[in-house]
Amino acid sequence: MGIQHEFDIIINGDIALRNLQLHRGDNYGCKLKIISNDYKKLKFRFIIRPDWSEIDEVKGLTVFANNYVVKVNKVDDTFYYVIYEAVIHLYNKKTEILIYSDDEKELFKHYYPYISLNMISKKYKVKEENYSSPYIEHPLIPYRDYESMD
């Protein structure tokens, strides 16, 4: 059947981007557009629940915000999940964020989802699903201990 990880992102403990993984494959990622009218500091928690059926190691995660590398820290690593965290500062009205395990252009164009988050109007939308089935949960009600950002 093929490998399928689960990949979610929690933003500020308030917004959850769910099912960002590909339908099949060892890659996970997404493209975000965040609209904000003033400076904001957002805390991101990246949660990978690996499918160990065909892999021995989970791929790392790379994050870029407006073409600048964002420092990503691994905060937990168990058999059931791997958690990374990062802080992204929004200085511009529009911030483009790329999150990925593999940066092939083809993955962003046809496979990874594209999501728009308007922090001004609080309208959050999946613009393109591509080869995934993402959805947005807001407000977030954490149903696993490691989803809480306290």
Curated annotation (Swiss-Prot):
Induction summary: Expressed in the early phase of the viral replicative cycle.
Which BP terms does GO give this entry?
symbiont-mediated suppression of host innate immune response; viral process
Which residue spans adopt a coiled-coil conformation according to this UniProt entry? none
Q: Which UniProt keywords apply?
A: Early protein, Host-virus interaction, Inhibition of host innate immune response by virus, Viral immunoevasion
InterPro entries per the UniProt record, alphabetical? Poxvirus_C7/F8A
Q: Which family does it belong to?
A: Belongs to the orthopoxvirus OPG027 family.
Outline what the protein does: Inhibits antiviral activity induced by type I interferons. Does not block signal transduction of IFN, but is important to counteract the host antiviral state induced by a pre-treatment with IFN.
Q: What is this protein called?
A: Interferon antagonist OPG027
Q: What is the lineage of its organism?
A: Viruses, Varidnaviria, Bamfordvirae, Nucleocytoviricota, Pokkesviricetes
